[in-house]
A protein has these predicted regions:
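Positively charged, low-complexity terminal tracts
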Residues: 1-130
Length: 130
């Protein structure tokens, strides 16, 4: 069996689903970080700023208020953009006072944990497939 067919056979598909309020938290977090990167010249790696910005731009065009079936919608970001979002959550939780957070600390922490879990699953599946 060719390696390509073997990979195809072993590939398991996983999807991340976020409720609309989680999409809103994600949008707010990314908007906050992108705004600070440009306004304040925050010293974060260029690749993180870039993927956070591209994720933010995608979310600007994603209708966060539409009623999805059962209130669930698939998240429209790439893995790189989700990594940028995870980094954004961590950055904001560590460096911002509560009164400057775009959402509550609990909401941002819950989103960070969900992103971390999702990206860990992707890593595990990628490792299994090689």
């Amino acid at each position: 069996m060719s390696r390509k067919n073997k990979l195809k056979r072993n590939r398991r598909s996983i999807t991340v689903q976020f409720t609309n309020p989680e999409c809103r938290v994600m949008f707010n977090v990314m908007e906050c970080l992108v705004s600070d990167v440009y306004d304040l010249g925050v010293d974060i790696p260029a690749i993180i700023a870039s993927v956070t910005n591209s994720g933010y731009e995608k979310l600007k065009n994603y209708n966060l208020t539409d009623n999805m079936p059962d209130g669930i919608g698939e998240f429209p970001l790439t893995v790189k953009e989700m990594c940028g979002a995870l980094y954004s959550c961590n950055w904001i939780l560590e460096d911002y006072d509560d009164d400057l957070l775009p959402n509550s600390r609990e909401e941002i922490s819950a989103l960070r944990d969900k992103l971390d879990n999702y990206l860990s699953q992707i890593l595990a599946i990628s490792s299994d497939s090689v």
